[in-house]
């Protein structure tokens, strides 16, 4: 099985404190979320965590878009 970077690690490459882009804002906020599942790759587990704990995420569609970018970058 090939090594795959965690979603969190990928998301951190999208940070940009000067950007108003939804994914950049998600990444900026996730950086400060001390309980974010940093080693997780699984969509369902990440989605459940975010739905229950990420008040900083304005819409799950932002996560969906970021996760698709993650998959595109892993292939």
Swiss-Prot record:
NCBIfam families: PRK13672.1 (NF010193). It comes from the Bacteria. The lineage of its organism: Bacteria, Bacillati, Bacillota, Bacilli, Lactobacillales. Belongs to the UPF0346 family. Gene3D superfamilies: YozE SAM-like. HAMAP family: UPF0346. Pfam families: YozE_SAM_like (PF06855). This is UPF0346 protein LJ_1103.
